Amino acid sequence: MSYRLVRELAADGVHVAVACRVLRISTSGYYEWRERPPSARAVADEELRAQIVEIHAMSRGSYGAPRVHAELRLGRGVRCGRKRVARLMRLERLQGVYRRRGKRARKTPAVHDDLVRRRFVADAPNRLWLTDITEHPTHEGKVYCAAVLDVYSRRIVGWSIADHLRAELVVDALEMARWRRRPPGGQTVVHSDRGSQYTSWAFGHRLRAAGLLGSMGRVGSAADNALMESFFGTLQLELLDRQRWSTRRELASAVFEWIEAWYNPRRRHTAIDDLSPVDFERLHAAAVDAA
């Protein structure tokens, strides 16, 4: 409504008469509207707007209307429509972040068959892990991050950060995943692209020693590891691309905090019923215990 826009402009320092003249509305009409008691709907909208602003800030400015709506509904028990949330976010000039593609590493011939074939589904934790590498610049030089994602819950179960692309980068991420999850031998597929780190002897040796089943997608096909592409796109958008990083240590600390304090325990995912990975796994464990 034009009157609300006048009020917002006035709050920003624009004279009411000037705003009314530009918008071609009556100044007296604006003052009359301003003095009216707010309707019940307007009061409810103001209360909802305050919660929306709080949730958007909690998400580090990353949530769009769908996830803000999910947090209201599931996290706070607020009943409201997604379109209403989107409208109020527009009034607050809030929006989520949007994805861009990153660079791909050099590919080599596969040393494992493709056991996944783009079927990114799992009926329990530790059935299917995906792994990949991303990079990001700092003033000191590039930082490389390898991560291991459990398809069942979208949880990052292992990760590592380094200033190089040697095989130990991906081996360290795998070792963290093994230490945290302790999967039984012969039951967990580890799917990657054909980057030289994943075709290396060191990575293959760790897979075999742990009884993990290696799997590789085709050359140059992002769709063959789409969930990892999606995760790293989210990491870039919600954290890495939002500022310039001075040091590798600064960036590494931020990635640690984002994964362990935000993404795994709190960030909601539409693919897992708008729950966080930790909460989704907790429900799974409760269901198994009750069975």
Where are these regions (language model features)?
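Charged DNA-binding/catalytic regions of mobile-element recombinases
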Residues: M1-A291
